Each structure stands twice: as structure tokens, then as C-alpha cells.
């Protein structure tokens, strides 16, 4: 059921945010460096595809979690515009981003994914969705580690890590 039948703003915002991901991926700038390690590519592909296995459910632990999806989608939109043409699937250094959402946390786009997926499984709760969420979060964590390892080869990124200490949630992680 689409937005026009359900009149759900969550579907509209999620569709908009994912469309922006595709647009910025297509118009991304050329990387200065890009990881050529098989493991990095494997993590990026599995991590990107795993959420595609989330499925709607008849029941949710917390149906009002759709507001987490809305917040996550809005956060994702701001993060994508902050990242702009530096969008990548695999660890790559296009430009070290330090402005916008990146002035608060180092991985705002990943943080938005966590929030959207969490909201989704809380409002569409099944064992399968929880398993997909767990796998997605594991691969997202691995992506962060591999991406930061690659970006830390750039002295500007190491300075940025000292300035912006938190990866996903300010003052926590």
C-alpha cells in the first residue's frame, strides 16, 4: 500500500530520503582513495542489502514507533545534504566532511539508518525482522570501523576524530 492509499507521512518521507540516497550516489564525486579490500566491499554490500529483507507485519511492540521512522527519515535527509556528493557505499575518501550534521557526530547517515530501522521493527515486530535488524546493525558497525580505518589514513580525518568524538549518538557513542 503506497502513500496515496495509506496517507502515511512515514512512507512519503522514507521514499524521499531513499530517493535522495540514489540521487547523491549517482552524482557522487570521484574519490581520492577507495578501499580495494574484498572484506570492505563484502561488508558494504551485505550491510546495504540486509534491510531489504525487512517485511511488514500485522503487529508491533510499539505502533507509535512510526515517529522514530519519521525522525530518522528527516535526520537522513539532513545528513544526505550534509554529505552531498561525498556519498559512498564502500570506504572511500572523497572529501572529509566536517560541517552540517557531521559537526555533531561522525556518522549521521548511519545514525539515521539505526533510527529508521529501529522504528520499523518496533512497529512491525517479527522474529525475522528483529534478526534482520541485528544483522544490519552488526554490518553497520563493521562498516563504521572499516570506513574510519580507511579515512584515518588522511591526517584531516584524524584531526576531525579528535574534534568530533562521537560516532553515532552525541555524548554516548
Predicted regions, residues:
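Membrane-anchoring alpha-helices and their flanking helix-loop junctions
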Residues: 1-90, 119-173
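Solvent-exposed interhelical
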Residues: 94-112
Amino acid at each position: 500500500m503506497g502513500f496515496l492509499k495509506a496517507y502515511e507521512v512515514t512512507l512519503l518521507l522514507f521514499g524521499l530520503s531513499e530517493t535522495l540516497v540514489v540521487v547523491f550516489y549517482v552524482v557522487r564525486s570521484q574519490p581520492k582513495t577507495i578501499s580495494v579490500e574484498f572484506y570492505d566491499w563484502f561488508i558494504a554490500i551485505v550491510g546495504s542489502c540486509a534491510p531489504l529483507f525487512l517485511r511488514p507485519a500485522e503487529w508491533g511492540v510499539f505502533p507509535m514507533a512510526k515517529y522514530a521512522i519519521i525522525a530518522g527519515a528527516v535526520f537522513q535527509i539532513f545528513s544526505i545534504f550534509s554529505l552531498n556528493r561525498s556519498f559512498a557505499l564502500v570506504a572511500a575518501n572523497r572529501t572529509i566532511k566536517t560541517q552540517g550534521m557531521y559537526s555533531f557526530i561522525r556518522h549521521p547517515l548511519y545514525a539515521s539508518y539505526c533510527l529508521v530501522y529501529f522504528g520499523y521493527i518496533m512497529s512491525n515486530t517479527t522474529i525475522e525482522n528483529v534478526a534482520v535488524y541485528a544483522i544490519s546493525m552488526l554490518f553497520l558497525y563493521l562498516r563504521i570501523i572499516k570506513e574510519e580505518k580507511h579515512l584515518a589514513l588522511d591526517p584531516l580525518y584524524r584531526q576531525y576524530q579528535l574534534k568530533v568524538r562521537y560516532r553515532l549518538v552525541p555524548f554516548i557513542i
